[in-house]
């Protein structure tokens, strides 16, 4: 019953202070939502946040590593008041239960660390980000993953500026493996992320107008 379902949201922002607190229950969710999982990656982190802020009907899942990145990059999750934030506070990642009840039509994991991608490929779900990815897959929820390690040599943003990184072969192989997962679209750039999100929005608008 509804009393056994986990709470819909926990507050979090870049300083650990309360940000938004959801009071609605699963039964109150009339319209399926976007889910967005933040991991511990700083790769185009600010750009990913900009895209995230433009989405309607949004829930944001913040892993413990993501909360650290938010502080390091001096970012704040300034989002519309109706956005719900979930903090990684329990070993079982209780908020993922919402996927069973049709609360989400789309999951976006962006940006995704090589560690997150590796765990997703291996079927390991031991934090909030990997848990929501696993549950989205089990519930056939289409998922977009913005992978960080996609080329042998890359420029990425560190807290103090751009740096050069050289992803390992295993990192590149895991990104390729993830592309074969059901209901999963892997993107490799901010431009591709924007295009994938826009395509999803257009599909949803078409589906809503025909229903």
Regions found by a protein language model. Name each.
Residues 1-24, 210-211:
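N-terminal amphipathic/basic-hydrophobic helices that include classical n-h-c signal peptides
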Residues 20, 24-210:
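A cross-family phosphate/adenosyl-ligand binding-site feature
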């Amino acid at each position: 019953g509804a009393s056994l379902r986990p709470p819909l949201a926990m507050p979090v922002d870049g300083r650990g202070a309360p940000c938004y607190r959801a009071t609605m229950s699963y039964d109150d969710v009339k319209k399926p939502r976007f889910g967005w999982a933040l991991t511990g990656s700083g790769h185009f982190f600010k750009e990913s946040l900009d895209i995230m802020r433009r989405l309607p009907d949004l829930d944001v899942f913040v892993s413990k590593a993501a909360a650290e990145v938010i502080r390091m990059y001096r970012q704040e999750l300034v989002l519309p008041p109706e956005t719900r934030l979930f903090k990684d506070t329990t070993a079982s990642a209780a908020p993922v239960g919402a996927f069973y009840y049709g609360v989400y039509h789309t999951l976006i994991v962006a940006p995704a660390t090589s560690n997150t991608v590796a765990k997703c490929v291996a079927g390991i779900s031991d934090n909030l980000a990997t848990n929501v990815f696993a549950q989205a897959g089990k519930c056939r929820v289409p998922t977009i993953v913005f992978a960080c390690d996609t080329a042998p040599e890359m420029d990425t943003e560190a807290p103090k500026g751009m740096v050069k990184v050289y992803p390992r072969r295993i990192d590149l192989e895991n990104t390729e493996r993830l592309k074969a997962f059901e209901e999963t679209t892997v993107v490799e750039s901010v431009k591709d992320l924007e295009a994938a999100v826009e395509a999803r929005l257009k599909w949803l608008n078409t589906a809503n107008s025909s229903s």
